[in-house]
C-alpha cells in the first residue's frame, strides 16, 4: 500500500488516480490528519509526499515523515514534496528566478531511478515559485534532473530509496508521467 500525504493540493487526486491506474493500492491522508503512530499502524510499503500551495515548513507532518522514515520506507516527493525532502536533509528552498505555474518545459535527466528508461529531455509541467537551492543540496543527494536554466528538477538520495521531482508527472501535459510513477512502484 502507498500512503499518499495530501498537502491540500488538487493534484494529489491526479497522483492517486495515476497510481490506481498502475494497479497500486493507495490511501490518502491530509498532512494534518495523521501522526507517525498512525503511519506505523497503516504500515505502508511506500510513501508519496504530494504537491501543495505552501512551503515545506507549512506542510503539516511532511518534514517529520521524511526525517522519520528516510532509509526505512521508499519515498517519492512531488513538487512541494520534493522541496520538503531536500529541506529535511538541510537544503534551502528559495524563490525561483521565474515563476512556473502551468508551464511546460524540457527537463534533462540522468536516466536513473524514476527516470530509468525514459527519453531525455522530457517535456514536463511545472507549477512552482520555489526551488531547491543547488548550492545547499547536501552531498547525500545527487541531482537527477535539471531544467534548461539548470534549476534542480529531480534529486535522489545516494544510499536510501528517496527521490523527488520538482515538476508534476501527474499533469496531463507531462510526458511519460505514468512511466515515471511506474518506475517508483517497481522498487
UniProtKB/Swiss-Prot annotation:
Residues 1-187 form the Glutamine amidotransferase type-1 domain. It is an enzyme of class 2 (transferase). One of its GO terms (molecular function) is 4-amino-4-deoxychorismate synthase activity. Keywords: Folate biosynthesis, Glutamine amidotransferase, Transferase. Pathway: Cofactor biosynthesis; tetrahydrofolate biosynthesis; 4-aminobenzoate from chorismate: step 1/2. GO terms for biological process: folic acid biosynthetic process; L-tryptophan biosynthetic process; tetrahydrofolate biosynthetic process. Monomer. Heterodimer consisting of two non-identical subunits: a glutamine amidotransferase subunit (PabA) and a aminodeoxychorismate synthase subunit (PabB). Part of a heterodimeric complex that catalyzes the two-step biosynthesis of 4-amino-4-deoxychorismate (ADC), a precursor of p-aminobenzoate (PABA) and tetrahydrofolate. In the first step, a glutamine amidotransferase (PabA) generates ammonia as a substrate that, along with chorismate, is used in the second step, catalyzed by aminodeoxychorismate synthase (PabB) to produce ADC. PabA converts glutamine into glutamate only in the presence of stoichiometric amounts of PabB. This is Aminodeoxychorismate synthase component 2. It comes from Salmonella typhimurium (strain LT2 / SGSC1412 / ATCC 700720). The lineage of its organism: Bacteria, Pseudomonadati, Pseudomonadota, Gammaproteobacteria, Enterobacterales. The gene is pabA.
Amino acid at each position: 500500500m502507498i500512503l499518499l500525504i495530501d498537502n491540500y493540493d488538487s493534484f494529489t487526486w491526479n497522483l492517486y488516480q495515476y497510481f490506481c491506474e498502475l494497479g497500486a493500492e493507495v490511501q490518502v491522508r491530509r498532512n494534518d490528519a495523521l501522526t507517525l503512530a498512525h503511519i506505523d499502524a497503516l504500515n505502508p510499503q511506500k510513501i508519496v509526499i504530494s504537491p501543495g500551495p505552501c512551503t515545506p515548513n507549512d506542510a503539516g507532518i511532511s518534514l517529520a515523515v521524511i526525517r522519520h522514515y528516510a532509509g526505512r520506507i521508499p519515498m517519492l516527493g512531488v513538487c512541494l514534496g520534493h522541496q520538503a525532502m531536500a529541506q529535511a536533509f538541510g537544503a534551502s528552498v528559495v524563490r525561483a528566478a521565474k515563476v512556473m505555474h502551468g508551464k511546460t518545459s524540457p527537463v534533462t535527466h540522468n536516466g536513473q531511478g524514476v527516470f530509468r528508461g525514459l527519453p531525455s529531455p522530457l517535456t514536463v509541467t511545472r507549477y512552482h515559485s520555489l526551488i531547491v537551492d543547488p548550492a545547499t543540496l547536501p552531498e547525500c543527494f545527487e541531482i537527477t534532473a535539471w531544467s534548461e536554466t539548470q534549476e534542480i528538477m529531480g534529486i535522489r538520495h545516494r544510499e536510501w530509496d528517496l527521490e523527488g521531482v520538482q515538476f508534476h508527472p501527474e499533469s496531463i501535459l507531462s510526458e511519460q508521467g505514468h512511466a515515471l510513477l511506474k518506475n517508483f512502484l517497481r522498487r
